[in-house]
């Protein structure tokens, strides 16, 4: 599915097609436009064949066109929602140009629409240039997954195709970009040795220090199956 809401339940039941979501007042609408991602995170639900076949966020019929996404949106009044979030199974900025086109069209109709991006923070490496000027004025919040306080552990977790350079590029090129609001979100993974749903406090403190040095916000949330 392309447009969905989050129910608060665990697993696949936590995602609900917007057509089945009922009253959208005060809710976030999530936009899922691609399966593509430059990482292969060990904690990601998309890693198992079962999830890829059965999870409703997996775009089995290919990526929706800009026109198809806008047609879905045309059925709903976005004045009543809380926030629009580009998220999903893939990295939204793998379709940077298309995402921007969708936002531009929606903001022509809803100029006060709040828009957030959930990203792994690799767009500059994906495109080989600084893409942050294209985010300015379109997104109100850019939420970048941090996950770990050092590059080696981060690479072990994300298995990024860009290797070690990925971590530094995210911190010094992605996080420090001139966005109006820059919210760094640390999405924790489950520590299977400790059977815990969040990082140990000492690692969280290191992540807090990284964000403090960068002048950005850290939001810690537990891993969700």
Predicted features, each with a name:
Residues 1-35, 42-61, 78-80:
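N-terminal [4Fe-4S]-dependent radical SAM core
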């Amino acid at each position: 599915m392309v447009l969905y809401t989050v129910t608060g339940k665990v697993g696949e039941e936590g995602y609900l097609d917007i057509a089945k979501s009922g009253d959208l007042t005060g809710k976030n609408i999530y936009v899922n436009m691609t399966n593509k991602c430059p990482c292969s995170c060990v904690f990601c639900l998309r890693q198992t064949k079962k999830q890829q076949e059965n999870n409703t966020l997996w775009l089995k019929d290919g990526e929706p066109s800009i026109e198809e996404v806008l047609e879905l949106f045309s059925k709903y009044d976005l004045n009543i929602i809380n926030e629009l979030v580009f998220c999903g199974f893939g990295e939204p900025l793998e379709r940077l140009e298309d995402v921007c086109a969708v936002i531009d069209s929606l903001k022509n109709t809803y100029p006060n629409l709040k828009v957030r991006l959930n990203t792994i923070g690799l767009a500059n490496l994906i495109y080989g240039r600084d893409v942050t000027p294209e985010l300015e004025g379109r997104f109100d919040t850019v939420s970048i997954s941090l996950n770990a306080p050092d590059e080696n552990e981060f690479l072990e977790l994300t298995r990024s195709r860009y290797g070690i350079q990925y971590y530094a590029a995210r911190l010094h090129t992605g996080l420090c970009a001139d966005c109006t609001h820059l919210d760094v979100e640390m999405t924790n993974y489950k520590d299977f040795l400790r059977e815990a749903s969040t990082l140990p406090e000492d690692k969280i403190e290191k992540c807090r220090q990284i964000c403090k040095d960068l002048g950005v916000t850290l939001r810690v949330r537990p891993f969700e199956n």
